Amino acid sequence: MTSQNPTQEPENNDHLIISQDSQHPANLIPELCAKFWHLGWVTGTGGGASIRKDDLVYLAPSGVQKELMKPEHIYVLDITKQLDPKQRIYLRSPPNLKPSQCTPLFMAAFTKRNAGCCIHTHSKWAVLITLLLESAPNTTMFEINNIEQIKAFGKGYTKSGNLGYHDTLRIPVIENTPHEEDLTEYLEEAMEKYPDTYAVLVRRHGVYVWGESVHKAKTQCESLDYLFQIAVDMKKLGLPWLSDVKPIA
């Protein structure tokens, strides 16, 4: 298991999380987490979010009720100084709190996909999809097409434009582990195997979603949760997730 023991630089650098700008990461993360809590995505301190701004990464902490989170709860690290993943160096650490075990997974999105934001939810719809897939022919891939909301997703890393209505959205599934940080290597493997994906489902656990900006990550996370809900209802009605709808000439 990867150690999450943080190394704190001498000065706590509280100035990094103090800003009147509503779009500053230290203000945005608590706002987003409160919204996600109301959606049922981050119940009981589960889940989280992280934003990268230039070389600085802002992270929600572990163990804080998401609807009560404040800027002073936010961790900050410099992505260029993380030479040893087993010993992260934080520029700013809130007192009496612990870094999230999601941190190495968020870092994977930033370093391997140049993401600007990564969101982790425990959405019941994400969990249900992974359960439904346990009895599917392909247990490690969620696929759906011919649904309008698919247009919210980009075509893939380094590619321009978004998916179309008739395209197939594919989200890989990895198995859960007893400790969240131990998911990192499996998440990274999924990123390598499926370079066009913007999300990875974790069996009986939740989903990680990222994007090049906060706007894109949030849009894709909301759209994916909508598609998960649609897919669960489709399964109840005996409707296939993949269909052969002919384009209108």
Curated annotation (Swiss-Prot):
Could you tell me the EC number(s) of this protein? 4.2.1.109
Domain of life of the organism in this record?
A: Eukaryota
User: In which pathway does this enzyme or protein participate?
Assistant: Amino-acid biosynthesis; L-methionine biosynthesis via salvage pathway; L-methionine from S-methyl-5-thio-alpha-D-ribose 1-phosphate: step 2/6
Query: Matching InterPro entries, A to Z?
Result: Aldolase_II/adducin_N, Aldolase_II/adducin_N_sf, MethylthioRu-1-P_deHdtase_MtnB, Salvage_MtnB_euk
One Pfam short name: Aldolase_II
Subcellular location(s): the record lists: Cytoplasm
Q: Where does Zn(2+) bind?
A: H120, H122, H205
Group of enzyme by EC: lyase
GO molecular function terms noted in the UniProt entry: methylthioribulose 1-phosphate dehydratase activity; zinc ion binding
- Look up the record and name the cofactor or cofactors this protein needs: Zn(2+)
**Which cellular component terms (GO) are annotated to the entry?**
cytoplasm
Membrane-crossing residue ranges in chain numbering? none
The reaction(s) this protein catalyses: 5-(methylsulfanyl)-D-ribulose 1-phosphate = 5-methylsulfanyl-2,3-dioxopentyl phosphate + H2O
Q: Cofactor comment in the record?
A: Binds 1 zinc ion per subunit.
Which residues are annotated as active site? E148
Residues that bind substrate: C102
Grouped into one coarse class, the protein's main location is cytoplasm
HAMAP family, per this entry? Salvage_MtnB_euk
Function summary? Catalyzes the dehydration of methylthioribulose-1-phosphate (MTRu-1-P) into 2,3-diketo-5-methylthiopentyl-1-phosphate (DK-MTP-1-P).
Q: Hey, which family's this protein in?
A: Belongs to the aldolase class II family. MtnB subfamily.
Q: What is this protein called?
A: Methylthioribulose-1-phosphate dehydratase
Q: Which species is listed as the source?
A: Botryotinia fuckeliana (strain B05.10) (Noble rot fungus)
